[in-house]
């Protein structure tokens, strides 16, 4: 997210293109003849969906595909055409009309209005605004839980002295690039960032480097070049891969971040769990989450994942790999991965630090 300054470090998978997430599955299991018949001169332009229609259709509704929305395409903005908040001495108004959204801040004597071109986030939303060639993170964001506007997390201590400062926090170049790179596709390392050329949301190439070349080769019936497959990564490498945007233990430690505000950094929290073993595929981001599908929020749906380790009585041939829970056999995450209120974020995040939770205990670092 763009809510905190950060250095995205970790180099275990430095050859991978930066991503927060894991997008389009790549498995050419069909015979070459069956695949090649897709690529006829009269056919529509080749896309990932040409061969991977099932995955592409599912991914169209996945959160990462909508990590950033262009104006006019965002359901939340269209469903809330008028948003207003009074914060300090400033009034904030967000209006959406005919697919166009504007962001206005006024102090009673003057006003500043800018178009909202980039909408970051699928649920809670922050906007990046452009003024005089510089980019700003909106000082207020939209929160469904609050059903309105509130201060953007991380910006609570900002005291604006004029309309421009009240509009939002000016982003340094590196942070602007990071924001667009983790919420969009097409940011080229080493080149000047041109937000207008960034594709909103994460496309297949973002996690499966080489997919564009693979499509170009497939048109020529050359199937030797394959895009990056995340199936070959172990649990620690997957955590680092996702953590390029969702943050890793290394990133948090280097920045000396502390407190419940960082519960939203799932790879970091998962890595400090006692049961996290870097080479065990049963506990990893992909073991519980299919990035090509919407997130399943029901606790019981994750029980089978937990029971992959914590199940069964000990026998001579199949000893259990971990202790079984003496309390319950279902809704494991409701006790061992509690939801934590994000300070100032008007939202709850599941704490991925897997542990035995004791009532009333302080937030564990």
Describe every region a protein language model picked out.
Residues 1-37, 151, 247-264, 281-283, ...:
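Post-cleavage N-terminal segment of exported redox proteins
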Residues 37, 55, 169:
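Ordered, soluble secondary-structure elements with a strong preference for glycine-centered loop motifs
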Residues 38-53:
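Local sequence-structure signature of Cys/Sec-based thiol-disulfide redox active-site neighborhoods
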Residues 46, 54-120, 126-128, 152-164, ...:
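Primarily the internal scaffold of c-type cytochrome electron-transfer domains
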Residues 130-139, 143-177, 185, 189:
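Extended acidic/polar, glycine-enriched regions
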């Amino acid at each position: 997210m763009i809510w905190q300054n950060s250095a995205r470090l970790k180099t275990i998978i430095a050859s991978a293109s930066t991503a927060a997430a894991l997008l389009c599955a790549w498995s050419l299991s069909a015979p070459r003849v069956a695949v090649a018949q897709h690529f006829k001169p009269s056919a529509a332009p080749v896309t990932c969906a040409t061969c991977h229609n099932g995955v592409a259709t599912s991914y169209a509704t996945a959160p990462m595909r909508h990590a950033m929305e262009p104006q006019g395409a965002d359901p939340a903005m269209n469903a809330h055409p008028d948003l207003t908040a009074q914060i300090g001495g400033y009034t904030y108004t967000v209006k959406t009309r005919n697919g166009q959204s504007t962001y206005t801040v006024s102090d009673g004597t003057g006003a500043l209005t800018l178009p909202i071109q980039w909408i970051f986030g699928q649920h809670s939303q922050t906007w990046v605004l452009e003024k005089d060639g510089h980019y700003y993170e909106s000082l207020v964001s939209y929160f469904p839980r609050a059903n309105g506007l509130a201060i953007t997390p991380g910006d609570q201590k900002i005291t604006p002295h004029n309309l421009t400062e009240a509009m939002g926090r000016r982003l340094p170049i590196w942070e602007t690039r990071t924001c667009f790179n983790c919420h969009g596709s097409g940011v080229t390392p080493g080149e000047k960032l041109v937000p207008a050329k960034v594709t909103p949301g994460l496309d297949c190439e973002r996690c499966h480097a080489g997919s564009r070349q693979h499509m170009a080769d497939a048109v020529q019936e050359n199937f030797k070049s394959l895009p990056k497959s995340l199936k070959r990564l172990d649990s620690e490498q997957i955590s680092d891969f996702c953590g390029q945007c969702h943050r890793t233990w290394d990133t948090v430690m280097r920045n000396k971040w502390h407190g419940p505000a960082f519960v939203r950094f799932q790879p970091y929290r998962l890595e400090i769990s006692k049961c996290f073993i870097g080479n065990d595929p049963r506990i990893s981001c992909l073991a519980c989450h299919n990035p090509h599908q919407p997130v399943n929020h029901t606790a019981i749906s994750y029980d089978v994942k937990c029971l992959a380790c914590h199940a069964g009585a000990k026998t001579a041939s199949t000893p259990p790999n971990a202790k079984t829970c003496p309390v319950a056999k279902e809704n494991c995450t409701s006790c061992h991965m509690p939801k934590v209120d994000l300070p100032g974020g008007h939202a709850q995040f599941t704490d991925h630090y897997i542990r035995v939770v004791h009532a009333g205990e302080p937030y564990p670092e």
